[in-house]
Amino acid sequence: MRIEGAIFDLDGTLTDSMYIWNEAPKALVRKFGGEPPEDLARDIREMGRREASEYMVDTFCLPCTPQQVMEGVNALVTGEYRDRVPMKTGADTLLERLGALGVPCGIATASEAFQARDAMVRLGLWKHFLFAFSSLQYGPKTGPDLYRAAARSLGSAPERTVVFEDALHAARSAKRAGFLVAGVYAPSAEEDQEALRCLCDWYLPRLDSPDFLAALERG
């Protein structure tokens, strides 16, 4: 089957940036006087930004608003995207191959759209994308709306659009919405890898996995 569109997650898929989301929420809770558990990131990983901020304010009785938490986290992470987050191995090779095949690509991220652009511009990858959409505008990845909006902008039907995701809950949402899904290995979610492998149409230990590149060529 010929792929007519590709939608990429950002954190853990295009970039090795999950460390940001392991540390930034804990730093904000401490800033406002709370004592977060070491695994706070795991507790909030399936939540959207707003829901996670509300959870932190309520759970740790923080003397601030959810909006202040969101703004504080943004202040911590924006510089990381702009200046430091590294590219996942093979991202450039895969994107070049998709471009050579005429497959349009977009980003669908739980981060801010401008953060995705900042990272992609610095890494020299932004030229491969038509847009970056954020779940802050289109809804969390527990639902299909973000992926559907991205597919509409690509001009591709879900059944001919592949979604690249490292997060199991996001891959499930895309699969339920009728998309093809490529699960991307992420060491931060080691315990989810077998389920991701079973769920997805393809499982990629790295983005430039030879078997997947060959499948793209075959169409």
Regions found by a protein language model. Give the residues of each.
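N-terminal helical cap/lid subdomain that shapes the substrate entry/recognition surface
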Residues: 2-93, 97-101, 114, 126
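Residue-level detector of anion-binding/catalytic polar loops
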Residues: 35, 104, 180
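Short linear Ser/Thr-Pro motifs
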Residues: 17, 109-111, 167
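Conserved SAM-binding loop
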Residues: 14, 105, 163-164
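A structural signal for short, well-ordered beta-strand elements
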Residues: 45-46, 62, 84, 109, ...
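Conserved phosphate-coupling serine/threonine residues in phosphotransfer and NTP-handling enzymes
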Residues: 13, 109-111, 185
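Short, flexible loop segments at the rims of nucleotide/cofactor-binding pockets, characterized by
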Residues: 82-86, 110, 181-183
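Asp-based, Mg2+/Mn2+-dependent phosphohydrolase catalytic module
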Residues: 1-4, 96-99, 113, 117-219
